[in-house]
């Protein structure tokens, strides 16, 4: 698996940026890939000096296709219940963008208990959120005591 991940990384480094035909010439054309279909299209005919065309040979190995660079399968998580369905050895959690700060903190705490890696929040940011949660808890305790 690690060998295939390293191979995929090397292949991705070699892979050119596939841009739409004539995208450099007209501002109104975005760079998003569109297959050239014109009858006289030099790009479709794969002329040497024209930009490269998407081909199957640029594809990554099937075993690691679609995986996170760490080798874990990327699973979108909305709440703690979703998190408990994951296998920590093969899957990693990606917290959805619509999840708020309070629920995000709950998910981080539970993920640490279960040994699940969160893929879209760095360790530093997780620590920062947990410290913020502790600070808020201490503040709430002080308010209830007064």
From Swiss-Prot:
Highest taxon of source: Archaea
Keyword Transmembrane helix: no
InterPro entries tied to this protein: Ribosomal_eL32 (IPR001515), Ribosomal_eL32_arc (IPR023654), Ribosomal_eL32_CS (IPR018263), Ribosomal_eL32_sf (IPR036351)
Entry keyword set: Ribonucleoprotein, Ribosomal protein
Entry's Gene Ontology molecular function annotations: structural constituent of ribosome
PANTHER family per record: 60S RIBOSOMAL PROTEIN L32 AND DNA-DIRECTED RNA POLYMERASE II, SUBUNIT N (PTHR23413), RIBOSOMAL PROTEIN L32 (PTHR23413:SF1)
NCBIfam families in the record: PRK08562.1 (NF006332)
Name listed for the protein in its UniProt record: Large ribosomal subunit protein eL32
Native source species: Methanocaldococcus jannaschii (strain ATCC 43067 / DSM 2661 / JAL-1 / JCM 10045 / NBRC 100440)
Lineage: Archaea, Methanobacteriati, Methanobacteriota, Methanomada group, Methanococci
